[in-house]
């Protein structure tokens, strides 16, 4: 793997349930030497269906030729704004890795989607179809990259804690945009 590899880390900001209509989604492009190449800040609908298109637009933005891989904090943004990492990979040609700290309870997720967003059940089932794989102390899904290569990339970009630095920085920035300062665990 090259030393100058760049990863786009993506996470959303907090929102007030049943009140906020939109929330921020931040992308941080980080080189493996910890140099921040760029930041992309956009907004998505809470419980909407635009997060996938917004993420694709981030990847196809100004730094499109420099992004080697994308890492996301899960597959839901702004509540139940569900993304399918396979679709993102197919639309951009860039490998995508979804990361969560805890093993997703797929049955519980589908039950919640069925109850509150029945029109999104098929999308959720498709997005969750290849299930999470445990890697060290996190769970990942990947598209366009082997699990072995995904593991190498994640370990290369993880310096402290469990989340890779690009995702951790995206979380910190998104939270600061909404709350005025970073807060909580990244």
From Swiss-Prot:
Pfam families: DUF99 (PF01949). InterPro entries: Endo_dU. Transmembrane segments: none annotated. HAMAP family: UPF0215 (MF_00582). Belongs to the UPF0215 family. This is UPF0215 protein PTO0905. It comes from Picrophilus torridus (strain ATCC 700027 / DSM 9790 / JCM 10055 / NBRC 100828 / KAW 2/3).
